[in-house]
Amino acid sequence: VHWTAEEKSAITSIWNKVDVPAVGSEALSRLLIVYPWTQRFFTSFGNLSNAAAIQSNAQVKAHGKKVFTAFGDAVKNPEAVKETFAKLSELHCDKLHVDPINFKLLGQILITVLAAHFGKEFTPHVQASYQKLVSVVAHALAHRYH
């Protein structure tokens, strides 16, 4: 995948302002609320019975932070996403058996959350750049499945 200087700049200009724990928590919470079947991968997280329980769940918050800290590695080095996520792809495929469509869903939710947080700053160009990045990350995470 070729990345232009403009795409990289658009991505980092927003990501440098992201509160990763807050955005990670919100994005993972939204995934579990909007797509409730994804909750089956998080049964060890305790109470996920409703939106309020999910949004206040400490394990959801911690895992959201972990997921989007890892996503930050893709932001830092978009040319090496496949290598960066090789072990996570193996984990999610071989051990957790996560359907790869869920990676795409979480990427779309991240875009929604960033747009909500950054408003007018999240221009169509920024959105297109993030769309490309979340697609590349989702593909890398699904790599082990092919």
Swiss-Prot record:
Quaternary structure per UniProt?
Answer: Heterotetramer of two alpha chains and two beta chains.
Indicate yes or no for the key word Cytoplasm: no
Q: What is this protein called?
A: Hemoglobin subunit beta-1
Q: Which GO terms describe its cellular component?
A: blood microparticle; haptoglobin-hemoglobin complex; hemoglobin complex
PROSITE patterns in the record = GLOBIN
Enumerate the UniProt keywords alphabetically.
Answer: Heme, Iron, Metal-binding, Oxygen transport, Transport
The cross-references to SUPFAM superfamilies, in alphabetical order and at most eight, read: Globin-like
Record's keyword annotation contains Membrane:
no
**Residues reported to bind heme b:** 63, 92
Gene Ontology MF terms in the entry: haptoglobin binding; heme binding; metal ion binding; organic acid binding; oxygen binding; oxygen carrier activity; peroxidase activity
The free-text tissue note of the record is:
Red blood cells.
Q: What does this protein do?
A: Involved in oxygen transport from the lung to the various peripheral tissues.
| Family statement | Belongs to the globin family.
Q: Which InterPro entries match?
A: Globin, Globin-like_sf, Globin/Proto, Hemoglobin_b, Hemoglobin_oxygen_transport
Q: Which CDD domains match?
A: Hb-beta-like
Q: Name one GO biological process term.
A: hydrogen peroxide catabolic process
All copies of domain Globin, residue ranges: 2-146
